[in-house]
Swiss-Prot record:
Signal peptide as annotated in the record: none
GO terms for cellular component: cytosolic small ribosomal subunit
Organism listed in the record: Francisella tularensis subsp. tularensis (strain SCHU S4 / Schu 4)
Keywords: Ribonucleoprotein, Ribosomal protein, RNA-binding, rRNA-binding
Domain KH type-2: 39-107
Gene coding for it: rpsC
Pfam families named in the record: KH_2 (PF07650), Ribosomal_S3_C (PF00189)
Entry-linked SMART domains: KH
Function: Binds the lower part of the 30S subunit head. Binds mRNA in the 70S ribosome, positioning it for translation.
Record's subunit section: Part of the 30S ribosomal subunit. Forms a tight complex with proteins S10 and S14.
Keyword Metal-binding on entry: no
This protein's name: Small ribosomal subunit protein uS3
Length: 222
């Protein structure tokens, strides 16, 4: 029987990069990992209205470089960069080292799995029918250039007594192909009937090893 694995984790080191890039010896590893978890939790909570897709953390020397990928960069930056400065000071308190915060705008939130999952979850919390929410998200993703999308919702759907899972797919989503650029994310909808889980897979096309090398070189230049 086939076993399901996280589509992001299985592609790490091949077409995906780690979201935390730093080195630590065995005595400091757990402390730094715990810091990363706390920083991510703090930022996701603080920037709940900013549609944050992912947070990358780098630790060059005795500093920290945090890149926030968001669909609403204006909310994070604030007037004349005031909000981002406050954020930097708060993260500095958490980590205890100098912190640099960079903001990267998500150009197409319709094909970002995390943002799509959170959007569907928010609609479920507002009592929108799950099939309508799924259909709307899939149509928007396919219009924005996705090659395929699959959405699954699990829980007491529509207030049913027995929890169940429902899913819908448009296009193709190849989970077995390592070079397939499949974005995967989950979210939770807190409804009056209980928690409803949302899973989203978005296929954006194939990435070849040469293309990955080009991306890394471009990052180093910038």
């Amino acid at each position: 029987m086939g076993q399901k694995v996280n589509p992001n984790g299985i592609r790490l080191g091949y077409i995906r990069d780690w979201r935390s890039t730093w080195y630590a010896d065995s005595s400091r590893y757990a402390t730094k990992l715990n810091e990363d978890i706390k920083v991510r939790e703090f930022l996701h909570k603080k920037l709940a209205a900013a549609a944050v897709s992912k947070i990358q953390i780098e630790r060059p020397a005795q500093n920290a470089k945090i890149t926030i990928h968001t669909a609403r960069s204006g909310i994070v930056i604030g007037k004349k960069g005031e909000d981002v400065e406050k954020l930097r000071a708060e993260v500095h308190k958490l980590m205890g080292i100098p912190v640099q915060i960079n903001i990267e705008e998500v150009r197409k939130p319709e094909i970002d799995a995390k943002l799509v999952a959170e959007s569907v979850a928010q609609q479920l919390e507002k009592r929108v029918m799950f099939r309508r929410a799924m259909k709307k998200a899939m149509q928007a993703a396919m219009k924005s250039g996705a090659k395929g999308i699959k959405i699954m919702v699990s829980g007491r759907l529509g207030g049913a007594e027995i929890a169940r899972s429902e899913w819908a797919r448009d296009g193709r989503v190849p989970l077995q192909t390592f070079r397939a650029d499949v974005d995967y994310a989950t979210a939770e909808a807190l409804t009056t009937y209980g928690v409803i889980g949302v899973k989203v897979w978005i296929y954006k096309g194939e990435i070849l090893p040469g293309q990955i090398a080009e991306k890394k070189n471009n990052k180093k230049r910038s």
